[in-house]
C-alpha cells in the first residue's frame, strides 16, 4: 500500500506544473482515483489473504479444498478486477492526459515516460476488457 501512497504527490505536482492545460483537473482526479482503487485492493488483500493462508496451512484435506475457492475469489476480485482492470482505466486517463499537457509545456523525457506508461496501461485495460 505504500506504493499507492507515493502517487498523490506526483499527481498534485504534475497538476500544479501543467495547471494551464485543458482538463488537467480531470486528469488529476483520475490519478487520485488510481490511488483510491489501488489502496482499497491492497487493504483488502492485506487483511484477508494472511488469514486464508494461515487457515490453509493448518487445515485438513477437505478444509483445504473449501478454502481454495475463497482465496481464488479474493485473488480474482482484487488482482484481476481492481488492479488490472478497474485501476488501469483511470491510470490511462491520468497518464495520457498528463502526457498531452507535458507535450505542449514540459520537457520531452517527461512526455515520453508518461506516454509509454499510459500506452502500457491502455493495453492492459483493453486486454482485460476484451481479451479475458
Predicted regions and their residues:
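Hydrophobic, aromatic-enriched alpha-helical segments typical of multi-pass transmembrane helices
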Residues: 1-132
Amino acid at each position: 500500500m505504500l506504493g499507492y501512497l507515493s502517487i498523490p504527490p506526483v499527481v498534485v505536482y504534475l497538476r500544479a506544473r501543467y495547471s494551464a492545460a485543458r482538463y488537467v483537473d480531470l486528469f488529476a482526479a483520475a490519478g487520485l482515483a488510481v490511488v483510491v482503487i489501488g489502496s482499497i485492493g491492497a487493504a483488502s488483500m492485506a487483511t484477508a489473504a494472511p488469514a486464508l493462508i494461515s487457515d490453509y496451512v493448518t487445515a485438513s484435506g477437505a478444509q483445504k479444498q473449501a478454502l481454495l475457492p475463497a482465496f481464488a475469489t479474493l485473488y480474482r476480485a482484487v488482482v484481476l478486477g481492481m488492479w488490472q482492470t478497474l485501476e488501469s482505466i483511470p491510470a490511462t486517463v491520468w497518464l495520457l492526459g498528463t502526457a498531452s499537457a507535458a507535450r505542449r509545456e514540459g520537457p520531452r523525457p517527461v512526455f515520453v515516460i508518461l506516454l509509454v506508461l499510459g500506452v502500457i496501461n491502455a493495453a492492459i485495460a483493453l486486454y482485460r476488457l476484451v481479451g479475458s
